[in-house]
Regions:
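Glycine-rich phosphate-binding loops that contact phosphosugars or nucleotide phosphates
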Residues: 1-59, 138-177, 193-195
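Short, solvent-exposed amphipathic alpha-helical segments in soluble enzyme
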Residues: 9-11, 98-106, 128-129, 151-159, ...
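Internal, active-site/partner-interface "lid" segment
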Residues: 40-74, 230-256
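Glycine-rich phosphate/diphosphate-binding loops that line cofactor/substrate pockets in enzymes
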Residues: 71-81, 128-131
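Anionic-ligand anchoring segments at beta-strand to alpha-helix junctions in alpha/beta enzyme folds, i.e.
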Residues: 82-130
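Short hydrophobic beta-strand segments
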Residues: 82-88, 135-138, 167
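Glycine-rich, anion-gripping cofactor-binding loops and their flanking helix/strand elements
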Residues: 121-158, 198-216, 225
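Peripheral docking tails and interdomain loops at the edges
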Residues: 181-256
Length: 256
């Protein structure tokens, strides 16, 4: 176990969570470990139910991504995009940054990647777009937030500067577009985590991070392979490592 876990497990003011061994991925970039830590933190902070029902829904959605998006992922990789922009609002902004990081890590920096919020991207960051750029928008399940997401999505498609603009959503009732991928549960929006015949409570944006990130991780892995790299260890120079080296942990509140 890591030093921080060992310290926290014996501290009265800390709450340490030990994840199962299956979450301890062995590759360079964190994939299952990221998902495991995110879900564990969400449950620990009571942002996701601890009874396992919601987690099971999210697991099914993740499996749906891997089963149904292979053709789309393969098509994106064949396009050989040199830049990728991920967009997300609220919690999905953090996911956009994580998705961009995965692309950077697994392609050893050969694919320039940016993670931004839709409103922020409208300003200076938008200049990164060119014909070799893929834009992936993680659409919010919040009705108000989604209106801003869709406005920018329409603007980017209207501008026709980026090579391709796609959107991921968990909602069926959105403006139809060939580049909108619907990650629906059991073939329909919402799925069912309640009584028979009762519509499931919509997933929160925090919960959506988990199936959305599977798409981003798979895209980064396949793009890495297309560049002739080894996804488990793409950085041949050894300048970055799976576990950061040479970091000192200093006593908190010590001399300034």
């Amino acid at each position: 176990h890591g030093e921080l876990y060992r310290r926290a497990s014996s501290a009265r003011s800390a709450y340490a969570v030990l994840l199962p061994e299956a979450c301890n991925d062995q590759s360079f970039a964190m994939t299952s470990s990221f998902s495991g830590m995110l879900l564990a933190a969400a449950v620990a902070l009571r942002l996701v139910s601890a009874d396992g029902t919601r987690a099971a829904r999210l697991a099914r959605l993740g499996a749906h991504v891997l089963a149904s998006c292979v053709a789309e992922l393969t098509s994106l990789v064949r396009a050989q995009f040199e830049r990728v922009v991920y967009l997300g609002s609220s919690e999905l902004k953090g996911l956009a940054r994580e998705a961009a990081l995965k692309m950077l890590e697994l392609t050893d920096g050969k694919v320039v990647s940016v993670g931004e919020a839709p409103l922020g991207f409208r300003h200076g960051p938008k200049t990164v777009l060119d014909g070799s750029t893929l834009v992936v928008a993680f659409l919010s399940n919040d009705a108000y937030t989604r209106r801003y997401d869709l406005d920018l999505l329409a603007e980017l498609r209207r501008d026709a500067v980026a090579g391709r603009v796609i959107a991921l959503t968990n909602r069926m009732h959105l403006p139809e577009h060939s580049d909108t991928l619907v990650l629906a549960e059991d073939g329909a929006a919402g799925g069912a985590d309640g009584a028979a015949g009762t519509p499931a409570e919509p997933l929160t944006d925090l919960e959506l991070c988990l199936p959305y990130v599977v798409f981003a991780q798979a895209l980064a892995m396949l793009r890495s392979l297309s560049l002739g790299l080894t996804p488990d260890s793409p950085n041949a120079a050894g300048t970055v490592n799976r576990v950061v080296q040479g970091v000192s942990i200093y006593p908190y509140g010590g001399a300034r």
